[in-house]
């Protein structure tokens, strides 16, 4: 799959933008704060109906206007798809795929797939478990609508369970009904996460080996608060029952997929605690490029690769690995200079110069 064309209107610092993209490498060059990342952000938004930079949609609208528009034409093996999104300042949005209105965000997932790599992705390794869970959830949602459905249901039931825990009229029988529903969704979520981690380990072994010239081994380990061998549902239900007194005191559910994490080990060393910044960056790179392989395995097409100002952050080995993968994947790169890229561009590649919301091919 690849993006054939993009149109933006009143989106951040773009009043009107229309671009035809190459199905190969597309490079957006310019100084900082000129609008390069805004292009990548708009593509990401069309995949997930959310920005990777802000939780407030109104930030995406040009400050002089009340609404912004994004339109993408995506070429796929079987059928081209057009995605149109209108973003309103009151927080509402209207999404259409091939002129058909999308009523639920989950219906948008999988229309096309993206993998983004940016300097902020170091947070996946360095910061809280919630960021690592978000990484897993976002990757799984775009390849599995069933995962998205179970995740939404789980969070809904979890919130309702927490209300019951805090209620003065606490009813244990009602709580048990919610627990059984929670366990069903959790079972699917954890199994899918474990399978995804297994796939990252499979592909990541080869990717990390190539980046480090065989000097390091990397392992990803899912860390669940529920210890189980075969029957996750039984183990989770028992944990909920055993933790009931504490959960009542705190007014929250203290265990479940919403509290899980995963650890990254390089040569058996916890990268978050003891890894160098270079090792942490390599771990993120391994995760992202493993995701490329996983999406290709499941959908039979490579996703679009978005590289947001990351080349300047990479040493020569990491940079060489990234650039060597671009031949089969539509890649959209932002950078301040083209020197590192010249050997990897061909006749299909396009270079765009960006200056204050204006783009010249």
UniProtKB/Swiss-Prot annotation:
It comes from Clostridium botulinum (strain Alaska E43 / Type E3). It is found in: Cytoplasm. The keyword Signal does not apply. NCBIfam families: recf. Its main location: cytoplasm. One of its GO terms (biological process) is double-strand break repair. ATP binds at residues 30-37. Keywords: ATP-binding, Cytoplasm, DNA damage, DNA repair, DNA replication, DNA-binding, Nucleotide-binding, SOS response. GO terms for molecular function: ATP binding; single-stranded DNA binding. The RecF protein is involved in DNA metabolism; it is required for DNA replication and normal SOS inducibility. RecF binds preferentially to single-stranded, linear DNA. It also seems to bind ATP. The keyword Nucleotide-binding applies. This is DNA replication and repair protein RecF. GO terms for cellular component: cytoplasm. It comes from the Bacteria. Gene3D superfamilies: P-loop containing nucleotide triphosphate hydrolases, RecF/RecN/SMC, N-terminal domain. Belongs to the RecF family.
């Amino acid at each position: 799959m690849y993006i054939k064309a993009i149109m933006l209107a009143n989106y951040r610092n773009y009043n009107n933008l229309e671009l035809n993209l190459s199905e190969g490498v597309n490079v957006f060059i310019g100084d900082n704060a000129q609008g390069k990342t805004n292009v990548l952000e708009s593509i990401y938004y069309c995949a997930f109906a959310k920005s990777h930079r802000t939780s407030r949609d109104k930030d995406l609208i040009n400050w002089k206007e009340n609404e912004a528009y994004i339109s993408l034409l995506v070429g796929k093996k079987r059928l081209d798809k057009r995605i149109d999104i209108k973003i309103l300042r009151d927080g509402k949005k209207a999404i259409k795929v091939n002129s058909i209105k999308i009523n639920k965000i989950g219906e948008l997932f999988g229309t096309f797939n993206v993998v983004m790599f940016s300097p902020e992705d170091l947070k996946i390794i360095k910061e809280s478990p919630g960021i690592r869970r978000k990484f897993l959830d976002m990757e799984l949602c775009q390849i599995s609508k069933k995962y998205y459905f179970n995740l939404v249901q789980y969070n809904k039931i979890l919130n309702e369970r927490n209300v019951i825990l805090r209620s003065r009229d606490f009813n244990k029988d009602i709580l048990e009904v919610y627990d059984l529903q929670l366990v069903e969704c959790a079972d699917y979520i954890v199994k899918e996460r474990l399978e995804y981690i297994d796939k990252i380990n499979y592909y990541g072994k080869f990717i990390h080996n190539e980046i480090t010239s065989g000097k390091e081994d990397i392992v990803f380990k899912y860390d669940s608060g529920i210890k189980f061998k075969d029957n996750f549902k039984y183990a989770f239900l028992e944990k909920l029952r055993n933790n009931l007194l504490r959960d009542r005191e705190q007014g929250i559910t203290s265990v479940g997929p919403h509290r899980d994490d995963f650890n990254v080990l390089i040569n058996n060393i916890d990268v978050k605690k003891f890894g160098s910044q270079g090792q942490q960056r390599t771990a993120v790179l391994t995760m992202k490029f493993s995701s490329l392989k996983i999406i290709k395995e499941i959908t039979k097409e490579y996703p679009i690769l978005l590289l947001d100002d990351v080349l300047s952050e990479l040493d020569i080995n990491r940079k060489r690995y990234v650039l060597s993968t671009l031949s089969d994947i539509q890649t959209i790169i932002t950078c301040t200079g083209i020197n590192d890229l010249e050997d990897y561009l061909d006749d299909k590649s396009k270079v765009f110069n960006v200056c204050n919301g204006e783009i010249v091919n």
